[in-house]
Structures are given as structure tokens and as C-alpha cells.
Amino acid sequence: MSKYDSHLKCSFCGKSQEQVRKLIAGPGVYICDECVELCNEILDEELMEAPTSPVASSVSSREDRPKRRSSRDRLSLGQIPKPREIKKYLDEYVIGQNEAKKVLSVAVYNHYKRLSDIQAKRTGTGATDDPVELQKSNILLMGPTGSGKTLLAQTLAKILDVPFAVADATTLTEAGYVGEDVENILLRLLQVADLDVEEAQRGIIYIDEIDKIARKSENPSITRDVSGEGVQQALLKMLEGTVANVPPQGGRKHPYQDCIQIDTSNILFICGGAFVGLDKIVEQRLGKKSMGFIRPAEGTSKEKWSADLLKQLEPDDLVKFGMIPEFVGRIPVMASLDPLDEDALIAILTQPRNALVKQYQKLLKMDNVQLEFKSEAVRAIAQEAYRRKTGARALRGIVEELMLEVMYELPSRKDVKRCLITREMVEKRSTADLLMHPSSIPTPESA
């Protein structure tokens, strides 16, 4: 070292070169032999505690968990849930949307039958010489925000005996760019299946916000659309059926990484999105066919008119919206969800098994307080949610604002045994009177 090196220190422990045996230089930093030895000891300890590979680690950890019955053990036709049974279960959690429920129920039932047919041919219990192969029919759900698309998918996951994963299309980008590869969608399904590849290959994937990957213009651009058309291109083979290489730890793939191969031929894909503006494209097409403008019937709301237009959707309309023709062709089944009116929002507040009113009643019951909503208060909440135009999502925000002071004060008060929410309290967003005079509240007709 030169004479200028006398003040060099380790960038990690701060010891000078005179205090250590060796000081190793890097680009702008230095590390001493003691820090190198300490790092080696830490790495050795971690390697001794952890299995040798990420996949082995995941496998060993899932062996300690209760095992879920494999779909391979129960795919006889007698055990497959019927479409009516699936829809009945969805009715317990989701209000309305009967057409979408029927589409999903039939699709899931047929998915089970496809798996049963494949299993029968492999085991020799079915007609091995039958040349007919059952092809899957991927599904597209369209509807305004807050209409229940994601909730339908989440509710399906509770009843199904096959792995079910939910993914978000907005996080996906074309390979080689910042963001998630499309293979990460399969990783989620693989994790739900406890890294059982054969079980994951029988699963169902729901891709939310699929309309957000529409290309930015109808005509191809000279600039790359890495989060739009690029993602659609990457999803094509996965939707149709291909053997994909999935990195076990997620993230980007690299040449020196061990990947898990998954065949997507038997994975059912359900895509959902709001598709804002698609109704205008349908309206324009229908207007041209009728040699003029088409108008909604008198008394029809704008939301209901948009939903009626989506029921007349054709594949070309989706292409004009920004979905490439190859992508549209791989999702043959389409269903639109109806917008939620005031009556539907009231039902959502009170009727489902996980209704918001029931949730907050349970929360206050844990503090030994009975919570009651007057029927007019429930209607006022629904009216405010309808005004916000965000569907059922607005309900929780409104009720949370309304209940904030109640939930803040009640745990500290032992004199309150019952709380009543009235329409006036909803409109003024105030619960002060309720908290100050709990004993003077008369017994009302509650919702």
C-alpha cells in the first residue's frame, strides 16, 4: 500500500488496517478479514438451520400442516357439486348477479367433469377408446366497480375442492421489464396447492382487473406497451395450455435458477374487469346497425342501460376496447354483472352471511353491547353508497365513518348496553347523542 493508505479502515467494523491482519479493497469500500470470517459464520449457521433448497424447505414446512384431500381422490361424478348447489352457496354471500352465478356454477361443474374424465382415462376406469376430449372454456366477467366480481371469485374459493388462486393483472408486465412475470400467477396457484404440481394443474385461477392490460390504442404502436399488449401476448399460451417454467421463489427468472414446470392445459382461467367505456363501443355499433342513435327506455338509469348494452357484447367490441383478437378468442364465455341499486345495497348490508351490519354487531357484542340499526338508517347508508357510484365498496367506508366514535368510546364505558343508529345520525355522521344518553334510547323497530 502507498503512504496514503495509512488511514484506511474497514467499512463495516471501522477498524484500521493496523488493527487487522488483512484489509481487502473493493470499489469504494474495504472489508477486514474479521468481518469476512463473521459473515462466513452467519452463512454457515443459516445453512445448517435451513434445508438445502427453497423447494425442499417449502415441502418440509407443508408436511407439518394438516393435509388437504387431493382432488384426485374425489373426482367421481357422484361427489361433484351440482350447478344448483354451487349457486346456492354463492347466494349466501353475494346478492343478485344471478346470470354471473349461473355462468360460474356451470363452468366450475364442467371443469370438475373434465378432470373426472381425464382421471378415468388415466386409471382405465373410463372409455379409453373414446376420441372425444373435453376442452376448457375460460370465462370473462364484466361489470361496474363494486358489483361483486372479486367477491364471487373469493366465495368460489371457499367451496371448491380444487386449488383456487386470485391474481391482479395490474402488477404484470412483459418479460424483461420491471414488474411481475405472468408465471407468478401460476406460483400463487402452486402455493395454494402446497407445491403439489399435479394438484395445481387441476386448479382455477381468477385474474382480476383484466381490462387494465388493454393496449393503449386500437392500432399497434411503434413503442412497446409492456403492461398492456405485451402482457396479453404473454398470457396467450398460458390460457390455451402450455408447459410454463415457474420460479419457486417468485420474481424474475434467470438462467441459473431451478424452475418448476406446470402444464396449464387443464387450469381454468376466469378473468374479471370493469371495462369502463366498453358500453359506448357497443352502443356505437348498435346505433350504426339501426341507422341512427339508440336511446334507453324512459325511466332506465344510466347504470342499467350500460349493463343492458354489455349483454349484447360481441368479440369485436372487446378488440376495439384494446384486447387483442387472439386473447379474446381464448375466453369464449362472457357474462356481465348488473349494477347495484339502492335495494340491492340494502340487501348487501343485512342479508348475506358476512353482511356488514352483522359484522359490526359482532364487534360490539364482544364489548357486551347490543348494536341495532333502524331500517331508515340502513336505507340512508345505501343511498349514500349509491350516490358515491362505487358499488358495495362504499358501504364499508360509510359504516366505518359512522361507527368510529362508537367503537372508540364504548370499550371504556360500562353503562352502555345497547346502541341505536338512526337515519339522522347517518346523515349528520354524528353519534354523540348516542354515546351521551344510552339509557334514554327507546326500543325501536330495528333492521
UniProtKB/Swiss-Prot annotation:
InterPro entries documented for this protein: AAA+_ATPase, ATP-dep_Clp_protease_ClpX, ATPase_AAA_core, Clp_ATPase_C, Clp_protease_ATP-bd_su_ClpX, ClpX_bact, P-loop_NTPase, Znf_CppX_C4
Region (Disordered), start-end ranges: 50-77
Superkingdom of origin organism: Bacteria
Transmembrane regions listed in the UniProt entry: none
Ranges annotated as biased composition (Low complexity): 50-60
Domain ClpX-type ZB: 1-51
Subunit structure: Component of the ClpX-ClpP complex. Forms a hexameric ring that, in the presence of ATP, binds to fourteen ClpP subunits assembled into a disk-like structure with a central cavity, resembling the structure of eukaryotic proteasomes.
This protein's name: ATP-dependent Clp protease ATP-binding subunit ClpX
Underlying gene: clpX
